[in-house]
């Protein structure tokens, strides 16, 4: 089993546990260039989302080297998704890291979302 298959397996296990609880989750996906965060309801509908691919985020990150793929950009995405969730009336979520290690950009999204008022 290679690294990608292992990550996908871990992600499936996490999603299965969250699905049993029927709670809203904050799902994070990471690529080399961007990071994506979505608030997903128990019925698999996306309630709020933010990413470094959004035009508003790109404007805020303009001028930085590696603008979409760094910890500062991930923190901005975490803050934005938390603000959108709170505006939609969502205060508590389960964190779905999609099999990625809780380190670096994934950790930055989670910590920024917590600081912005989202409870895990």
From Swiss-Prot:
Which Gene3D superfamilies has this protein been placed in? 3.30.420.100
At the top level, the lineage of the source is Bacteria
Keywords of this protein's UniProt record, alphabetized?
A: Ribonucleoprotein, Ribosomal protein, RNA-binding, rRNA-binding
Disulfide feature: none
Offer a single GO CC term for the protein.
Answer: cytosolic large ribosomal subunit
Q: Which CDD domains match?
A: Ribosomal_L18_L5e
The record's InterPro entries line, in alphabetical order, gives: Ribosomal_uL18_bac-type, Ribosomal_uL18_bac/euk
Instruction: Please list the GO biological process terms of this entry.
Output: translation
The terms under GO molecular function for this entry are: 5S rRNA binding; structural constituent of ribosome
One Pfam family named in its UniProt record: Ribosomal_L18p
Residue ranges crossing the lipid bilayer per the database entry: none
Keyword S-adenosyl-L-methionine tagged: no
What's the subunit arrangement here?
A: Part of the 50S ribosomal subunit; part of the 5S rRNA/L5/L18/L25 subcomplex. Contacts the 5S and 23S rRNAs.
Q: Outline what the protein does.
A: This is one of the proteins that bind and probably mediate the attachment of the 5S RNA into the large ribosomal subunit, where it forms part of the central protuberance.
**Family to which this protein belongs:** Belongs to the universal ribosomal protein uL18 family.
NCBIfam families according to UniProt: L18_bact
Name of this chain's protein: Large ribosomal subunit protein uL18
Name of the coding gene:
rplR
């Amino acid at each position: 089993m290679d690294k990608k298959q292992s990550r996908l397996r871990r992600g499936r296990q996490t999603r299965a546990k969250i699905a049993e609880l029927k709670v809203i989750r904050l799902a994070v996906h990471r690529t080399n260039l961007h990071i994506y965060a979505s608030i997903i309801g128990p019925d698999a509908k996306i309630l709020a989302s933010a990413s470094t691919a959004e035009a508003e985020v790109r404007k805020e990150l303009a001028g930085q080297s590696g603008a979409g793929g760094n910890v500062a950009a991930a923190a901005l995405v975490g803050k934005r998704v938390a603000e959108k969730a709170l505006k939609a009336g969502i205060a508590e979520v389960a964190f779905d890291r999609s099999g990625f290690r809780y380190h670096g950009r994934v950790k930055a999204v989670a910590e920024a979302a917590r600081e912005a008022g989202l409870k895990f």
